[in-house]
């Protein structure tokens, strides 16, 4: 039985870079050991909090799909940067394993966007380790975009540690977003550059597939429509969430919990659902209680370790839903609402029920890219407003590189909050190494005043999503 399951896994994973096959088998052995959590049509991998699981509506995980095929000229597939074991993203520990296994020649290590700068020396092992340092340490891909021709700003200086210092075509470094739970997306890409006015999600994902194959995979010819359709169909089949917690156990309907990917699949959603800014077409008022999947755990009694872990998750859900936050200085939110101070909650920006992204497009600047938070491995862009002369510095102009608007500097979307435990580090630039770092960022940025207990509970909850 075990051999047959391993053989099936090999078949599923064979078109993914071979080190991931090895990692997948190792993880699957741990998965088999948890026989009580095996489900039909569910693929699970161990992560730092327990087990991440992906459910496919197709009834299988088709390794022959173009998503898993090399369609360009550099050996990459979509799966190169969207791994099941990493919640359909990619993480530094597994990237480092691939580097060590292949001496830095795995397809993810390509200079076009895997290196800190495309001109980096990759002639020796040490040179490759240096050239791909952001990818290895933070899982960052270089994104190069031209300053829009109609921009109302000028990039007057670039301080890039890797000599990619053009002021007309900027190099930015961002985490690959997970290619799962896409049914809930309202914005494609961190900066929304693959979301087009008047177009539906399928159109946007199709456009993204073409651009990714042309850019990341360096394809010589465009994808056929059949290939695009097949990739998008494949992506839309996946729903991912944490299925097992190391301390609390199963999260998927056992003992009153309603976690796991199948619940995500069944979650009702529509554009604007629960939007606090008036975008809900149903007219139903905003409800800050975004998550209810662990409600029944809040009344548990018992002093054993597992019960205490469940109670911590339930308390963390309550913290997420109910702790008030004084939201100030968030471009794209406070200024748009005309309110210098908005008394809100986590769900003010993460409002989609039991999913956690914003249910309408909402690019905002919460300060992650502020120059004050720069680390030595990040660039700094000095940008001047062509009309007012105002000058700002940022580590990533964000949405402004799409719209050409000075007011959009530093704006990004808020991602879906499912499957977090499997895909550290966090934020667009990987600046938060852990979920506790994420919580600390918000606590400091908005002067929330979390207690240590609240922080620990919130981390436990976020890790259970």
Where do the model's predicted regions map?
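N-terminal secretory signal peptides that target proteins for export/translocation
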Residues: 1-14
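Short linear interaction motif-like sites in intrinsically disordered regions of transcription factors
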Residues: 8-11, 21, 298
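Bacterial N-terminal signal peptides
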Residues: 20-28
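N-terminal signal peptide c-region/cleavage motif recognized by signal peptidases
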Residues: 30-32
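Periplasmic c-type cytochrome electron-transfer domains
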Residues: 35-465
């Amino acid at each position: 039985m075990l051999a047959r399951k391993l053989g099936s896994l090999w078949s599923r994973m064979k078109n993914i870079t071979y080190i991931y096959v090895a990692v997948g088998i190792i993880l699957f052995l741990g998965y088999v050991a948890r026989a009580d959590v095996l489900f039909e049509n569910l693929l699970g991998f161990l992560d730092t909090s327990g087990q991440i699981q992906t459910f496919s509506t197709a009834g299988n995980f088709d390794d022959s799909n173009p998503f898993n095929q090399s369609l360009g000229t550099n050996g990459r597939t979509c799966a190169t940067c969207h791994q099941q074991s990493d919640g359909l993203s990619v993480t530094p520990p597994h990237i480092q394993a691939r580097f060590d296994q292949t001496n830095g020649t795995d397809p993810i290590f390509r200079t076009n966007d895997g290196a800190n700068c495309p001109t980096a020396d990759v002639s020796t092992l040490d040179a490759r380790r240096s050239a791909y340092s952001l990818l290895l340490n933070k899982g960052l891909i270089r994104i190069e975009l031209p300053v829009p021709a109609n921009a109302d700003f000028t990039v007057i200086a670039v301080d890039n540690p890797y000599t990619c210092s053009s002021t007309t075509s900027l190099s930015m470094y961002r985490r690959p977003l997970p290619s799962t739970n896409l049914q809930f997306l309202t914005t494609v890409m961190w900066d929304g550059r693959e979301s087009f006015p008047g177009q539906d999600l399928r159109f946007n994902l199709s456009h993204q597939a073409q651009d990714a194959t042309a850019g990341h995979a360096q394809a010589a010819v465009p994808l056929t429509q059949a290939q695009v359709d097949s990739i998008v169909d494949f992506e839309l089949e996946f729903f991912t969430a944490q299925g097992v917690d190391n301390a609390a156990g199963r999260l998927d309907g056992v003992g009153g919990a309603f976690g796991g990917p199948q619940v995500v699949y069944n979650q009702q959603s529509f554009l604007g659902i629960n939007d606090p800014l008036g975008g809900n077409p149903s007219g139903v008022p905003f409800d800050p209680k975004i998550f209810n999947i662990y409600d029944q755990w809040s009344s548990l009694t018992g002093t054993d370790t597992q019960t205490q872990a469940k109670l911590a998750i339930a308390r963390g859900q309550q913290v997420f839903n109910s702790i008030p936050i004084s939201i100030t200085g968030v471009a794209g939110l406070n200024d748009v609402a005309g309110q210098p101070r908005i008394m809100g909650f986590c769900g003010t920006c993460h409002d989609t029920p039991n999913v956690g992204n914003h249910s309408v497009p909402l690019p905002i600047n919460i300060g992650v890219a502020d120059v004050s938070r720069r680390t030595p491995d990040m660039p700094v862009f000095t940008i001047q407003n062509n009309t007012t002369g105002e000058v700002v510095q940022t580590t990533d102009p964000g949405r402004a590189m799409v719209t050409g608007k000075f007011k959009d500097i530093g704006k990004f979307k808020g991602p879906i909050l499912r499957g977090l435990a499997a895909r550290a580090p966090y934020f667009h630039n990987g600046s938060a190494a852990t979920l506790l770092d994420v919580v600390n960022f918000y606590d400091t940025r908005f002067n929330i005043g979390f207690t240590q207990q609240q922080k620990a509970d919130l981390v436990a909850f976020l890790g259970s999503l």
